[in-house]
């Protein structure tokens, strides 16, 4: 099993064995990645998960191999060669192909023919020598159930067809040939409805199977599911027929034509449809896995957007008829005030809306306005921009992706937090908090509702959920969590913690006040020694009695850390000071590691934390663009240079918010002068990028952008 992981991922045997042992000992992936680098050779969370996933697949594969071997052995049909063949397979489907001839079959044409005792005729038909004609031989098999020579011959052919279909050697060859030579074709179904022409490019479409892109596989699948498209695989079986005939028909066999008919029937009725299903399933699985990877990467970048720290924010949930809901939150995310204004039709109380809005901004010293990007967003943005200009308000605004805000607002979490609020009022608070601390707010929402994926509703939902949960867990643990201020929604993603333990932490805080030292955590229900070990490195205790509790240094390394500080003449209160940084920069890591009897990777991490105890990995990402004016599509001209925020990355390019109603598309071919296979190699969600307007379609409200400077 380990060898197959080495072959697939190029990790060393030592690394793989270390990861499997650590996982067996109930260590979490974030804990292993952060605090067991000496054992793993510095593998990150994704690599550790790859080892775990592949190992679990191999365990299940081995279990299935043993089941198959046992079943064949019980039939008395297991040969040493077959056993070796089964054991060497590394794909489940190939094991099933080898097992196929020995499976208990449902009622088929061949099983019926065997029941009618026609198997001897099939064996005779394939034999080298024949003393009588096939018609004479078939005559011997006529009975109550086999009423004619034709029926007997047909039954024998059915048996031969199924034997050919069950041959794993033929299936492997056909699978390979069809994948490399076959063509996927699609056409529009008669009377199918596709009002918006979503699937127009697939009305008469064909592409070699081996070249079809992942996003096209999912588009075709959706079109088929919505009964707009018919999907077929085209494959010329002539060469395969010849190949099988050479294996199955003895030289000078007078029954050649009958066996050829059986071969053609086997291909058309049994093998090709089965292989088509397998290829379709493989293409779909590959495309779904890729879509999940795209969604995961986009979500990771969204979660790790830098927080807007220290700002008083006004969140706005725009709407027409029901009014724009307003909510002010302070720099700590605490709700301060709420209101509702009706600047848009059909109510159109614009003067009153202006008065109330300006009054709220001034009364609460609002520094930033966060506007949701849903219904009436464009009109609200214009309204806010006009007021900033007219009243010379010292504020800027930002457009916030509000996907999932309504899901959160109607959730139990939101009802518990704001029991007396309307759903839209909760949304306004959530929109404001999304800017202030995206990670803390977005963890309250089912990741699938955040909407930064591609065909996310078309993929395996369980696989998607597992992948996205892993992304959220990784992001939360990379950033770290303040144990005294974090919500239970955030705490439950901390390494080692469950939703129940997260609630117990909240209950403890409410009863006892702020936690001051890591040892206090042992008083919390269900937070035992193992849970403490797995979680404490990712929890932060701000203004506690132990300075190291506010760093990512694990308590298991506190002794070494204080030995280091003592050696340099510093104490726990000197963390992050310029003097300490200067001393730390002049150290010989290898010598020091030997002296302190600690691994170099752990020592490097300790020193990073001592230099920057409050380091936040999100600070490395681009900060969002703040605005005080708006653009319309009429303002755009081809060649115009703009700065924008990447909102979504898909296989065919990236959608960039440039401040007009619709996000502009930078096609994959316009991301760089060089060939780009994967847009994610160039851009990520949240990136601030320079773009130029490539083309404008005002009728469709579409803007095409390029990241290639047209003047170069």
Locations of regions flagged by a protein language model:
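Single-stranded RNA-binding regions, centering on S1/OB-family and related RNA-binding modules
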Residues: 544-545, 549-712
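Generic start-of-chain signal for non-secretory N-termini
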Residues: 1-17, 24
